[in-house]
UniProtKB/Swiss-Prot annotation:
<dbReference type="GO" id="GO:0015459">
    <property type="term" value="F:potassium channel regulator activity"/>
</dbReference>
<keyword id="KW-0632">Potassium channel impairing toxin</keyword>
<keyword id="KW-0166">Nematocyst</keyword>
<dbReference type="Pfam" id="PF07936">
    <property type="entry name" value="Defensin_4"/>
</dbReference>
<feature type="disulfide bond">
    <location>
        <begin position="22"/>
        <end position="40"/>
    </location>
</feature>
<feature type="disulfide bond">
    <location>
        <begin position="6"/>
        <end position="32"/>
    </location>
</feature>
<dbReference type="GO" id="GO:0008217">
    <property type="term" value="P:regulation of blood pressure"/>
</dbReference>
<keyword id="KW-0800">Toxin</keyword>
<dbReference type="InterPro" id="IPR023355">
    <property type="entry name" value="Myo_ane_neurotoxin_sf"/>
</dbReference>
<comment type="similarity">
    <text>Belongs to the sea anemone type 3 (BDS) potassium channel toxin family.</text>
</comment>
<dbReference type="GO" id="GO:0042151">
    <property type="term" value="C:nematocyst"/>
</dbReference>
<keyword id="KW-0872">Ion channel impairing toxin</keyword>
<protein>
    <recommendedName>
        <fullName>Delta/kappa-actitoxin-Avd4a</fullName>
    </recommendedName>
</protein>
<dbReference type="GO" id="GO:0017080">
    <property type="term" value="F:sodium channel regulator activity"/>
</dbReference>
<dbReference type="InterPro" id="IPR012414">
    <property type="entry name" value="BDS_K_chnl_tox"/>
</dbReference>
<keyword id="KW-1220">Voltage-gated potassium channel impairing toxin</keyword>
<dbReference type="GO" id="GO:0005576">
    <property type="term" value="C:extracellular region"/>
</dbReference>
């Protein structure tokens, strides 16, 4: 996944293209929506 950044969060997240939700199984704990993609934290 491409790197992405959410304001107020340390480090970087994974950018998932054209997704409205973060996929399970990666240990993501938070996310921010960047239409039409989503940024899932932590990387």
């Amino acid at each position: 996944a491409a790197p992405c950044f959410c304001s107020g969060k340390p480090g970087r997240g994974d950018l998932w293209i054209l997704r409205g939700t973060c996929p399970g199984g990666y240990g993501y704990t938070s996310n921010c929506y960047k239409w039409p993609n989503i940024c899932c934290y932590p990387h």
